[in-house]
Amino acid sequence: MPAVKVVERTPLFLKAVVEGAYPSLVNSLRRVIISELPVMAIDTVIVVNNTSVMYDEMLAHRLGLIPLTTPLQSLPPIEDCESGLADPSECTVRFTLQVNADGEVTVYSGDLVSERPDVVPVHKDIPIVKLVKGQSIVLEAYAKLGRARGHAKWQAALASYYYYPRVEVRDESCRERCREVCRDLTNPLECTFNKAMTCRDLCGDKLHVDWERNKYVFWVESFGNYDVDTALREAFRILKRKYSLFLDALARKSSSAAEAKL
């Protein structure tokens, strides 16, 4: 039975020691987190007026990279949005941006006006473009649910892991030699497996480095679209659904093969 011990936690970051799981399972979770989690991002921009020095295409690109809060609990499942089962209007949010400069002014992400108060820029102070007196920007932007496998602007979080190192210091002089790489050689949470291996290259046979089988240090960092608890909950839901679809496909394949033999 896999076991998890949380060693560091904030609303947007989590580090834990995972034990008793196969690498394939841990890596599957990592890949779902970095490429499958749904988030809102601006995907379509209708420029009504743009007299700034920035091209419309670059302006739209910048808008798309602004992270938006994404209340998954009040949105349809991403699968329904992708398949068309959900009303498209429930999977999109309209923004407007209208700025007329009376002097030098910087347009920030906070100037975007959303039709939904729960879908807004995560950070209000992301600069979009600078305007001088007489310039203006008027546009409509539409954000939709998407996944990072389609474009990086839909990436909700990063995740990674390393094998839990097991370090044996055979000569105390090695600690000082490796201090710039690892302050505490025997602390797996500070000295990653790769760092320990770097120290082994420095110390030779004075340091032995191994790893514990099926034990890892796993961490997740959210970009702020939602907290890390929501990210993990959604990642497990997606992973569980993938396994169910895979088993169903296997069952159908097996059934078809059996019928063919008859």
UniProtKB/Swiss-Prot annotation:
Subcellular location: Cytoplasm
Superkingdom of origin organism: Archaea
Keyword Iron applies: no
Keywords: Cytoplasm, DNA-directed RNA polymerase, Nucleotidyltransferase, Transcription, Transferase
Primary site of residence: cytoplasm
One of the GO BP terms on file: DNA-templated transcription
Swiss-Prot/TrEMBL catalytic activity: RNA(n) + a ribonucleoside 5'-triphosphate = RNA(n+1) + diphosphate
Top EC category: transferase
Role of this protein: DNA-dependent RNA polymerase (RNAP) catalyzes the transcription of DNA into RNA using the four ribonucleoside triphosphates as substrates.
Species classification: Archaea, Thermoproteota, Thermoprotei, Thermoproteales, Thermoproteaceae
EC number, UniProt record: 2.7.7.6
The protein, known as: DNA-directed RNA polymerase subunit Rpo3
Protein encoded by which gene: rpo3
Self-association state and partner proteins as the record states: Part of the RNA polymerase complex.
MF-aspect GO terms: DNA binding; DNA-directed RNA polymerase activity; protein dimerization activity
Organism of provenance: Pyrobaculum neutrophilum (strain DSM 2338 / JCM 9278 / NBRC 100436 / V24Sta)
HAMAP family: RNApol_arch_Rpo3 (MF_00320)
Family: Belongs to the archaeal Rpo3/eukaryotic RPB3 RNA polymerase subunit family.
Any one of the GO CC terms: DNA-directed RNA polymerase complex
